[in-house]
């Protein structure tokens, strides 16, 4: 498709209307590169994708990809043996997560027949092991302690060093209080320092890091702290080195799969783009047009996509119709109709829904050419006519029988008689070479050309003679007429003058009267057609409502049958129980022989209906949702750490990837993380309580890491209350090591609480001093 037509018809602005519906960087990129195609099968597949996406939304009501950043540069860096940074790993982690979710979404689809989208969904690869490894990077772009034993050890040492350093500073602060400008610990050049009065600078031994602007205060790092700070500097350097090593290891894990991951990003972006097309279709009352294998265009109630309140029009450009000539005065909407046809074709050939009614049809052209507006080139010093004619010459040379040509005000800018003759000659050349053409003109001579020539049709834009305003309604088959006399009358020009003018143009008046009658007939036909369409739309709505009621009735009927079956079974089971009691009593009285009792019991049991639950769709779906599957995110109950299931060992045992560590877990040792459900529910302020495996009674876990003091204490208080209400026997409180402030506050709180029997740090393999286990009672 030639690029000039995309600029002339502002196709870029049309594409921009789809961007708000996109969620992924790859989807936005696909939209940016979108251009019209001239391949019938390709366009057909585009339309089938939208139709299939519609069936997905009908059955599931929601389908979301989620925000995915561009990972193409990260994939290139992997191929160049470069190591990725934390943000890049986080982006890939999100890609892996969404890939797994969409793959599971596809597997769970029911009552949906996909042909084209099936190929997209089934090409998405899932990598549960990689997903589990990247759990080492949390959503805050922070490398978790469990990423490696060495990192965990270093961070424990750093926390201990910070605690010792702070305590040491507090002691020094108290000891040298009389020498200080302020009783506080300051920071200079990343070092903890004391603000010492200049007059006492020699009383405090240490390294001077700064002096205040007034010179009255000297900031000294106490000598006792120098060695501690040097150790801290080394620990922080070791931490950075270990993080770099972990990033390198994670990059090496991803490198062999870089192309597959890039392909996943493209597939998800494409699904996102199809989803955006569907939402545009629904929100703009657009339609998926049929594709004509010949050049038969049929646009029903087509609208211009860039106008705020466009007037809908019908356009029938049959295969045997070569040229449509729109005649009539300016400002009636002729150019808009021309552009509407061009944009409908560009959108359709790009696989986009068009703003028209169902039943519309587009053709497939190799190229679309247009000469629209004043394209005068000042640099070339060309007149308006010369500029247009230069462009028209190019169009005539480049176009062929599989092109669509659009001319606005053909032949304008020169002597009217010569311009009209040129316009007719150009249209005749296009007609003879069977090039589909729509042209606008205000030359009356072209009306006769439209009537006298085969495969040519006149058209015009409706004008309201009462309001003296154009209606912008397209009138196909009716040539345009001048409304000058009628307008003059209504504006108050003397009737004698108007009649004299009419007598001077008797022939034209006769033609105008014929055209006026044609307009009336066309308007009457259009009203009848509009009424028929309204009835059709009502029938469609009625049909949909009936289907909906039928489905609801079927579902209600199934529920009633299920309920009746349950009640019947309960009655029979009750009767069976009572009968067994009677038989047992009779047996005790020896009134029946053992084999007679067995036979009687057998007959009674045969009365109980055996319910086939395998066909119960609700139970099947619920069971499927509850079952763990490869790729599911989990929380390990014993540690509260997040991981991903990468395989089923046997029975109820699963292999999980937690950071860089693999674990074998039973199903009661982890909980599934329902990411989709969490994303869809509105967020509420709640206590971060995660259920644990049942060890010596109910237990729960509260994570206070990263919380401020006041926030942590409020959550702890609410958590203990909730645990007591739920009869929890033990709870785990994760506070981390950090500065020790939260840990000490937790200890004080538990010591004071009358319902806390005892508490202690967790075992070393379950959190150590970073986690406190409290026994309640």
Curated annotation (Swiss-Prot):
Gene Ontology terms, MF aspect: ATP binding; ATP hydrolysis activity; ATP-dependent DNA damage sensor activity; endonuclease activity; mismatched DNA binding; ribosomal large subunit binding; rRNA binding
Assigned protein family: Belongs to the DNA mismatch repair MutS family. MutS2 subfamily.
Classification via SUPFAM superfamilies: DNA repair protein MutS, domain III, P-loop containing nucleoside triphosphate hydrolases, SMR domain-like
Superkingdom of origin: Bacteria
Smr domain location: 702-777
Enzyme Commission code(s) on record: 3.1.-.-, 3.6.4.-
InterPro entries per record: DNA_mismatch_repair_MutS_C, DNA_mismatch_repair_MutS_core, DNA_mismatch_repair_MutS_sf, MSSS, MutS, MutS2, P-loop_NTPase, Smr_dom
Name of the protein: Endonuclease MutS2
Keywords: ATP-binding, DNA-binding, Endonuclease, Hydrolase, Nuclease, Nucleotide-binding, RNA-binding, rRNA-binding
NCBIfam families: mutS2
Native source species: Streptococcus uberis (strain ATCC BAA-854 / 0140J)
